Design a protein with these regions (language model features):
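Active-site and adjacent substrate-binding regions of carbohydrate-active enzymes
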Residues: 2-13, 20, 24, 30, ...
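Conserved aromatic beta-strand anchor motif in extracellular beta-sandwich/beta-rich domains
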Residues: 33-37
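Short beta-strand and strand-turn-strand segments in soluble, beta-rich domains
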Residues: 39-41
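Short amphipathic
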Residues: 53-56
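Surface-exposed, short loops/turns at beta-strand junctions within beta-sandwich domains
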Residues: 58-63
């Protein structure tokens, strides 16, 4: 069998121009490394090593594209092909800047600040304190379910509350927090920023952020902020100047049309879209010392870029890769170990292969196929008949297409503030919910928990209303009597395994033969393996003698299970 993954690159995170040893595990005795340079394919003879073949080449470009020529054919990212593969089926290697080591396989926890925990009640906005969308905002009681007013509803969670919750998060095993936007905004979701230089006073202001950052640093934990750099809020002074004065310098920061209309996020008029063709936009968001992407790296460890796939010029995503790359480089100039990943809601591969970001929210390559398989419905509630084998092929295809260095920094999720919660989509089926999360933690990438999933937080609306926002943004239930303690124990075990088993954190992904209806794969690193099996309804599995990592017991022969992570003992 042929096998090539990140562990076969030495060094795995090279500088541009640095020589890299590229290895292939294979039974073949001879082969060539073919790599693309300046539009031509070049050959490098491979020499034997104890596990197969190897060759040394300088990384002249990023991405550096290559494929192996063996006696039986060409071995590329998607396996063996008899004829030369397309370039998109070559392996893609990137040179620095690359994801920081701390982020590889790290366990993330997403927090929607207004709904997580209230630390200082005096910070909660008063009922009707201002108008949003022409209507007064609403102060809601913590135990009230979210309603149709959505962004107008304030529960009063703040950064002091997040600080208070750190012992809970540390006990869970979380390594990094991702906070949805924290900068001043008139809405509770804060995706319509009106001041990038000011942490929202209703969240505790910069004082609370500094305290939170310091406490996280002391615990060895990281903080990721949400960078809303595709658009601003309509109340932002820059947009107000542009709107009122066509001769103002700010006018060029936005795209106005002859009829007076302007480009906005999804046509939502209170979120006018930035134009990165503007020198002023570039100065204020990328180049300037006080550009938010730079300034806040003094109090955080990275960014999640909102609607990263849409950012660009002229009211479009033109030159998207260029500007994503520039934002990421700016953050890393301020903090060398910064992590910058994007909300790439669809196929993330083309953007990531262009050496732009450190990773992406793994919707298309993980969350959507897994939840479609286990729930029988797609993201929008439409029936889907997806079999385990089909789901596996989708997962593997996306994994194989990723640049090797980004396979372990994908923000891998099942629930978020934008999509229905996983437990709700599974209609409260706790065993399928466990199966989904066991799969998430067994899969390559950085597993991400959405606040409350670990205690069984779901949502109140009926299934006739199949929607994420606002129902997926319910407040965290801090009354422990409301927690599903069995789920919480299960999540703590999953987190512990991800953190303590290098093969689960950094291992490659390989197929594993399994019965019909079972999604199965192997993780492999340095000759060690974990076998992973998942079945929607449960299955009888024939397994070698090994340690069941979740149940912490030895098994062998025939085993009945919905999910099984097995470390072979033979």
């Amino acid at each position: 069998m042929n096998y090539h993954d990140l562990e076969h690159l030495h060094p795995p995170f090279p500088e541009l121009g640095e020589e890299v040893e590229i290895r292939l595990e294979t039974a073949a005795k001879e082969g060539l490394l073919l790599f693309e340079r300046d539009g031509e394919l070049h050959e490098k003879p491979m020499e034997p090593w104890e596990g197969g073949l190897r060759a040394r080449v300088p990384v002249h470009a990023s991405p550096f594209r290559y494929v192996f020529r063996l006696p039986e054919g060409f071995w590329g990212s998607h396996g063996l092909e008899k004829t030369l593969p397309r370039y998109d089926r070559f392996f893609h290697l990137l040179a620095k800047p690359l994801p920081p080591e701390w982020a590889l396989g790290a366990v993330f926890y997403q927090i929607f600040p207004d709904r997580f925990r209230q630390g200082r009640p005096e910070l909660v906005p008063r009922d009707g304190a201002w108008l949003y969308g022409g209507k007064p905002i609403r102060k809601k009681a913590w135990n009230e379910p979210p309603g149709e007013e959505g962004a107008r509803e304030f529960y009063g969670g703040d950064l002091w509350g997040v600080l208070e919750a750190l012992p809970y998060l540390e006990a869970l095993g979380v390594e990094a927090l991702y906070l949805t936007p924290i900068f001043q905004s008139p809405s509770s979701h804060r995706y319509d920023t009106e001041d990038y230089g000011r942490v929202d006073p209703h969240l505790g202001g910069e004082e609370a952020l500094r305290a939170l950052y310091g406490a996280l640093e002391a615990r060895g934990m990281r903080l990721i902020l949400d960078g809303v750099f595709n658009h601003v809020g309509a109340t932002h002074p820059w947009f107000q100047k542009a709107l009122k004065d066509p001769t103002s310098p700010e006018r060029g920061m936005f795209t106005f049309y002859p009829d007076g209309a302007y480009a906005s996020f999804w046509g939502v008029k209170h979120m006018p879209k930035l134009d990165y063709a503007s020198a002023l936009t570039q100065e204020r968001f990328i180049l300037g010392k006080e550009a938010p992407v730079r300034r806040w790296m003094r109090l955080a460890h990275g960014w999640r870029l909102d609607v990263a796939h849409s950012l660009g010029e002229g009211g479009t995503n033109r030159k998207n890769a260029r500007w994503l790359r520039a934002l990421a480089r700016a953050a890393k100039e301020e903090r060398a170990d910064a992590l910058v990943f994007g909300e790439l809601s669809y196929d993330a591969v083309p953007t990531l292969r262009a050496h732009t970001l450190d990773g992406a929210m793994h919707y298309a390559g993980f969350a959507h196929p897994v939840m479609a398989w286990l729930s029988g419905r797609d993201l929008h509630g439409n029936p889907v008949a997806l079999e385990a084998e089909e789901a596996w092929r989708t997962l593997l295809d996306h994994y194989q297409a990723l640049p090797l260095q980004l396979r372990h920094s994908m923000y891998t999720l099942l629930s978020s503030h934008d999509i229905p919660r996983a437990l709700w989509r599974l209609r409260g089926d706790k065993e399928r919910f466990k199966t989904a999360y066991a799969l998430l933690f067994a899969f390559p990438g950085s597993p991400a928990l959405y606040y409350g999933d670990e205690v069984g937080l779901s949502r109140p609306n009926p299934y006739e209303v199949w929607r994420g926002d606002p129902y997926c943004r319910a407040p965290f239930p801090w009354d422990e009597a409301l927690w599903d303690q069995d789920l919480l124990r299960f999540f703590r075990r999953l987190v512990r395994l991800k953190k303590t088993y290098p093969v689960l954190r950094l291992g490659g992904l390989l197929p594993l033969k399994a019965p019909t209806g079972v999604l199965a794969f192997r993780r492999r690193l340095g000759g060690r393996e974990v076998l992973a099996y998942f079945a929607k309804e449960g299955a009888r599995l024939a397994v070698p003698r090994g340690l069941d990592l979740l149940r912490e017991e030895e098994v062998a022969g025939e085993v009945a299970a919905r999910y099984l992570l097995l470390e072979p003992l033979e």
